[in-house]
């Protein structure tokens, strides 16, 4: 990125844009670094309505979403093994029953997003849907994961349905679409749906993950040889998605806490989670980080 000339103060719009880019770059690095610390960001956080039938029931950074329908509910991401108790408390605080969850989805088969699935499956009897690329990872309790299988495992679960790229999953008239966005994990999935508010329809994107975990090589990866090409595919896919509400597997991807505080102050219009510019900036920053590492690794090759 070109260095700005010191010709005078930035305009408000330029300042906001630069702040967004710096934040996104920081998130791209911090989200990868957080993998070093077990249960990072797994502190209790208030459950709240984002818009329409879409609710946040996750923790400070480990995001979980409740999507309510007349025929039962979706739950996207289950957190660590001890996260389900907080998810349940949030669901019930919002006036819903955890036993009405019918489908458990996930963004990726890393332990911070799926270790709680066994608890929730037992509690709710819900069906587990997962990327067809990560069925084996979930059913092995993470042992076959290309990055963390050697270090961190979790209770294995039975996957009831293997989700393919582009598949639409419908419950009670509400549809979520799966977009394979691999690289961060081999079956990382970005989900999309639509919500409505005041007669207007909004496109929601739940980013599955774009960071490169610590210690992961993009060139000559021993257990994930196609990782670099998968990342390239992911950025093409993310750029193709229409996004109004920018959400993700980690609250840090999209500044969740700050946006929640703005919404809680009351009267925030538009809804602070409507952030298409923030989405584009996030994707730009994540791709730049990927390309920088890829270039550096190629230079170091003999």
For each of these PLM feature ranges, what is it?
Residues 40-94, 98, 191-212:
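Conserved beta-strand hairpin/beta-sheet module of binuclear metal-dependent hydrolase folds
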Residues 13-22:
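Bacterial N-terminal signal peptides that target proteins for export
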Residues 2-3, 7:
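Intrinsically disordered, low-complexity segments enriched in serine/proline and basic residues
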Residues 82-85, 92-168, 282:
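Active-site HxH/HxHxD metal-binding segment of metal-dependent hydrolases
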Residues 83, 109-115, 135-138, 186-189, ...:
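Active-site environment of divalent metal-dependent phosphoester hydrolases
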